[in-house]
């Protein structure tokens, strides 16, 4: 297995290659994953059950924090990444996040969520996702995994980036580099190796829309500018569809309707129309 070393520009070359594994982590709004480089290709490490993606969902089941599992209860936390560096006021006043208002522990200097009697901070919730990724990687690789490169939204400010670093640290990771998600996508496809010019690369995820303007010359990738919106992504498209289907059918907004709306969206990816409660969509 190839170990990729990432160093700062201008740093002296290391004569000896480290035998320590460095993993890449995509901490996503909807799903997260972890990978290693194997023969110059990214190899995604599968979670228990054989799935590559870990839903970024926090739940409390029988008094224990769980990740990626849901049940019929509404008391689960989705899209953890959207909450990072947000104040209680930010969460209450944001229409997308305000559904969590009843779970907020008010009076705290930093926001905490009370989930089935357990209070947990926002970085601690993110750390639970990192812990599951780490344990699965160590099980698959048969080795301790400490170092990681983590992708973050291009628009993340220092506070949000700091909370990602803190969450990873709580999980036992040493983050050697944060990389903007569109930039990571460009590297993943090796664009800098066979492409020259200035390009706009976008990443439309579950909860964020990011863009980076990249200049690629002679195998070197330079980030010219970045931007994005952390309230524009697949989750928001889902909710717009939920509201539309609710108005069309008279059904109340519920977890069941959200699941059905996602099914409609996915079907429309390969069909021109879908029947929903007798209506053509």
Predicted regions mapped to residue ranges:
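Oxyanion-binding/catalytic loops of NTP- or PPi-dependent enzymes
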Residues: 1-98, 104-109, 114, 118-119, ...
């Amino acid at each position: 297995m190839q170990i990729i070393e990432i160093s700062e520009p201008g740093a002296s070359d290391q004569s000896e290659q480290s035998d320590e594994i460095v993993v890449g982590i995509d901490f996503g709004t909807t799903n997260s994953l972890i990978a290693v480089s194997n023969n110059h290709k990214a190899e995604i490490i599968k979670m228990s059950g054989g799935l590559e993606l870990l839903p970024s969902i926090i739940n409390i089941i029988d008094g224990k924090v769980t990740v990626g599992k849901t049940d019929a209860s509404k008391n689960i936390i989705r899209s953890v990444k959207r909450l990072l560096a947000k104040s209680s006021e930010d969460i209450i006043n944001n229409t997308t996040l305000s559904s969590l208002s009843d779970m907020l522990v008010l009076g705290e200097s930093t926001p905490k969520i009370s989930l089935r009697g357990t209070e947990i901070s926002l970085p601690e919730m993110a750390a639970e996702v990192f812990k599951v990724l780490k344990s699965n990687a160590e099980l698959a690789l048969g080795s301790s995994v400490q170092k990681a490169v983590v992708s973050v939204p291009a628009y993340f400010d220092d506070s949000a980036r700091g909370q990602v670093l803190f969450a990873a640290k709580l999980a036992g990771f040493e983050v050697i580099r944060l990389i903007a998600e569109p930039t990571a996508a460009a590297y993943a496809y090796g664009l800098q190796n066979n492409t020259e010019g200035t390009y706009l690369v976008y990443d439309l995820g579950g909860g964020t829309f990011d863009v980076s303007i990249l200049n690629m010359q002679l195998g070197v990738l330079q980030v010219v500018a970045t931007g994005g919106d952390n309230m524009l992504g697949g989750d928001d498209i889902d909710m717009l569809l939920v509201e539309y289907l609710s108005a069309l059918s008279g059904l109340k907004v519920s977890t069941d309707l959200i699941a059905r709306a996602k099914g409609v969206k996915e079907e429309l990816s390969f069909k021109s129309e879908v029947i929903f409660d007798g209506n053509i969509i």
